[in-house]
Design a protein with these regions (language model features):
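Short, acidic, small-residue-rich periplasmic hinge/interaction motif at the N-terminus
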Residues: 33-35, 44-46, 77-81, 91-139
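Gram-negative outer-membrane beta-barrel transporters
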Residues: 504, 517-519, 525, 620, ...
Length: 820
């Protein structure tokens, strides 16, 4: 890391000298806002009598770049405001403006039609199968990032219970290591279990990009199912501090804080954010997977019980210091993330048996470096470097031997006509042998992207990703010296090249990608052996090396105004992660170092139409279909044998591991409709339907495979989401805003085991959420109220684990702007 910093700083200094002779240009940035401070989204800011223009973002912020020094007239227009013009003298490298405007009393039919693309539209029409989630409204409500993702077309968030439980993301049948999770372009796993999508509040997020299939250049990696990239807020044009706190059912308290400061003269910038979450997760379960074992060994299903031993507490902070929009860098930041989490483990893979006294603790210290420069060394060249070094610790304790029931009391048996607690088995904990496991990880992750525009509409880029993970596993109940510690090392190197083009008046956009990956794993397990009278330490090494090539392409064609045909294809590999190879005891995952890379051949084709404006009405349509062929799919192992009546407990597993399935095939389609009326009513409807089938026709003995053509278990394959939002202005107070929300979700029944079984099929899930938010006239305070799962429906997820029923919460948001 030290050498990386020195090298990059040298590069930065060199680039600053290399550009001293360039022409004098500036940036004009700021915010268009109405009375009360509310930002005006998608307003046009134009320098009159020039071709320089830009749209403000969803919060009213804008940036005009590369403006030659001189005098200009600025014209600001939008359908919802009265046009405004004013003069400006550009005589320094950065000008920051606050443009106050008046609301439009009526629509002027002679107003010039403004065309342009928002960041969301720009990403969604590049040819990738991608959806962009904007978080402006969600940040004001008591919603977490995973809930936003779960409402997105084609995305299913798989969670093993309540807040803080293990999460896996399914993108139209692809999950696990096939799906990448990124935070500002860096793998989220680098930051540790404490800093995950459960804990990062929407208030800290600018947008979420959900890719299905081929990934853009800056996210190159061993992923074939797609990726989720969380882009944190970076704007520092206005010094501000935002705080939020919420309290709700199950004794759940959440709070977050974020702030930014920028020195307008020299570009010095600081950003700070943090969060705290606490919950008892004490919700009630009552469905078919909730069971009680009586003293006479009879099993009672549909047992109503309140969850226990499920406390979750997490605290984290992110600190960054650097420079923005200066001569030698568009962005340069050094950062530090710290997080700490305590999480009780209430049960194993399924809910069959509750645990008491089994818990995990996590800590992470993460150091980051980000550098970004457009027109680096020469005009048209861009350099982006992200580097992370993290130190992560995981502590798992399981030392209680007593078995428990879901009423919170010890499991009983009848002996000599008397009910007594089931005697603990010597040396056994809740899930297996008693243990106190301490896992330490040291992770280095560096991504470099160098892009060059060789001609208008033609761009090439070269990307390199290097990631290493060193892991040490210790059992503190059986302490040994450092020579007997199990060590694991993983190194991934990926080189990727991309060519992007925009031709035919920018109607046709293509992206060609090729990559080469080198993956190496080494695990050393020492053991003490005696040969004659001599005791020695034997080091058993398991080493693997594999090299893989991949390629892909995307295309987007603007057939007619507002209609885009989008397609992509990819042939690539994905390798197992460190947790899949070497286990994850806090998540009930066993090791399987024999996993081999998974190969996938994917095809996607779809369209996006809109937004079509008809008077006060806006309509956007999206549809896509996909076909995915997988080989050696890396998947969680599920029960394969037929569940026999009277032996349903055979399907109750407390732990599992990742395995390689044979050939698989996933085909399906998805669609979405978005309707907006008068910028007050917003309605959304989306669905996803696919069949993910096992296609290995014969087993290793050449006999017909029992699982051939069966649906892969534990995967919801048909989901529907719908939501409605309505805005009311000037309610109770002038210039206030009241938003009312409604959301509904549907999940079709799916099996948690391979062979059909009534007892291991989740029922139909249909749930409703309602909520509201009230923004005070000064625009600084927002109060929101949310009622989730309002009808107290049964909701299930991974391996039939029941999720919370009805819950209510209230949230306060407060923003302090322009404090310096």
């Amino acid at each position: 890391m030290k050498y990386l910093c020195i090298a990059l700083l040298s590069l930065v200094v060199f680039s600053s000298f290399a550009q001293t002779g360039t022409s004098r240009t500036a940036m004009v940035k700021g915010k268009v806002r109405k009375e009360g401070g509310e930002g005006v989204s998608f307003a046009t800011i134009r320098l009159n009598k020039t071709d320089i223009a830009v749209l403000s973002d969803a919060e009213g912020f804008f940036e005009l770049k590369n403006i030659p020094f001189g005098e200009y007239e600025v014209l600001v227009t939008s359908l919802e405001i009265q046009p405004k013009s004013f003069g400006i003298v550009v005589n320094r490298r950065l000008h920051e403006l606050s443009v106050d405007v008046l609301p439009q009393s009526g629509i002027d039919l002679d107003e010039v039609k403004v065309t342009g693309k928002t960041e969301k539209k720009e990403i969604e029409t590049k040819g990738f199968a991608v959806a962009v989630i904007e978080t402006k409204e969600a940040s004001l409500r008591n919603l977490n990032t995973n809930e936003l993702l779960d409402r997105t077309v084609g995305v299913r968030v798989r969670q093993n219970g309540g807040v803080g439980s293990r999460v896996e993301y399914n993108l139209n049948g692809m999950s696990g290591s096939a799906v990448g999770l990124f935070l500002d372009g860096i793998e989220l796993s680098t930051y540790g279990s404490s800093f995950n999508l459960n804990n990062i509040p929407p208030a800290m997020i600018e947008r979420i990009e959900v890719y299905k299939g081929v990934l853009p250049a800056h996210l190159s990696g061993d992923y074939v199912g797609g990726a989720i990239n969380v882009v944190l807020k970076k704007d520092a044009s206005q010094n501000n501090v935002t705080v939020a706190a919420s309290y709700g059912s199950f004794n759940t308290f959440q709070s977050d804080l974020s702030g930014s400061y920028r020195n307008m003269k020299n570009g010095f910038t600081t950003r700070v954010s943090g969060f705290y979450t606490y919950t008892d997760n004490s919700y009630t379960t009552w469905g078919k997977f909730s069971k009680f074992v009586h003293a006479n060994r009879t099993l009672e299903r549909y047992y109503r019980a309140k969850r226990f031993n499920d406390t979750y507490k997490s605290l984290g902070g992110r600190f960054e210091v650097g420079f923005t929009n200066v001569k030698w860098a568009d962005l340069f930041f050094l950062g530090y993330n710290i997080s700490d989490t305590y999480s009780e483990i209430p049960h194993g893979t399924t809910m069959a048996r509750p645990y008491v006294g089994r818990f995990a603790e996590y800590d992470a210290h993460v150091f980051t470096l980000n550098y970004n420069k457009n027109n680096f060394l020469v005009k048209g060249m861009a350099l982006n470097v992200n580097a992370v070094r993290s130190y992560r610790g995981t502590f798992v304790q399981d030392t209680v031997g007593q078995m428990y029931n879901w009423d919170g009391n010890p499991r009983m048996l009848i002996r000599n006509g008397v009910e007594i607690p089931v005697p603990p088995i010597a040396g056994m904990g809740q899930q297996g042998p008693k243990s106190i496991t301490d896992i330490n990880r040291r992770i280095t992750n560096m991504r470099t992207n160098l892009a060059y525009t060789i001609a208008s509409g033609h761009r090439i880029s070269l990307n390199h990703k290097m990631e290493t993970t060193d892991r040490d596993d210790n059992d503190l109940l059986k302490p040994v010296n450092k020579d007997l510690v199990t060590t694991s090392n993983i190194m991934n190197n990926i080189i990727a090249a991309n060519y992007e083009s925009q031709i035919l008046n920018n109607k046709l956009r293509t992206n060609l990608m090729a990559k080469y990956t080198i993956n190496r794993t080494i695990q050393t397990k020492p053991e003490i052996i005696t040969e004659g009278d001599v005791t020695i330490i034997k080091r058993n090494k398991n080493r693997t090396v594999n090299n893989n090539r991949g390629y892909g392409a995307t295309v987007s064609y603007n057939v007619i105004p507002l209609l885009y045909i989008i397609g992509s294809t990819e042939n690539s590999y994905v390798v197992a992660t460190e947790a899949q190879l070497y286990g994850d005891p806090d998540n009930n995952i066993l090791e399987n170092p024999g996993l081999v890379p998974e190969k996938n051949i994917n095809y996607n084709i779809g369209f996006r139409y809109g937004a079509v404006n008809i008077g006060k009405h806006k309509l956007t349509l999206y549809g896509s279909t996909f076909w995915r062929n997988g080989f050696n799919k890396i998947s969680l192992r599920a029960v394969e044998n037929q569940i026999v009546q009277g032996r349903e407990s055979d399907g109750d597993i407390e732990f599992t591991k990742y395995i390689n399935l044979g050939k698989t095939q996933s085909r399906g389609f998805e669609g979405e409709i978005i309707y907006i009326y008068d910028n007050k009513l917003n309605a959304l409807f989306n669905f996803s339907k696919f069949n993910s089938l096992f296609k290995q026709e014969y087993d290793e003995k050449g006999k017909p495979h029992d699982l051939y053509d069966l649906q892969l278990p534990n995967e919801p394959f048909f989901t529907i989401n719908g939501s409605v939002q309505y805005r009311l202005n000037n309610v109770f107070q002038k210039s206030s805003i009241l938003n009312i929300y409604y959301n509904a979700g549907y999940v079709a029944p799916f099996s948690t085991v391979w062979m059909a079984s009534e007892w291991f099929t989740t029922p139909t899930q249909f749930y409703h959420d309602i909520g509201s938010s009230y923004r005070l006239p000064n625009g600084k305070m927002v109060v929101s109220l949310d009622l989730k799962n309002a009808l107290n429906a049964e909701i299930y997820d991974n391996f039939g684990v029941q999720k919370p029923g009805r819950s209510i919460s209230v949230k306060l948001n407060y923003t302090i702007s322009k404090f310096l």
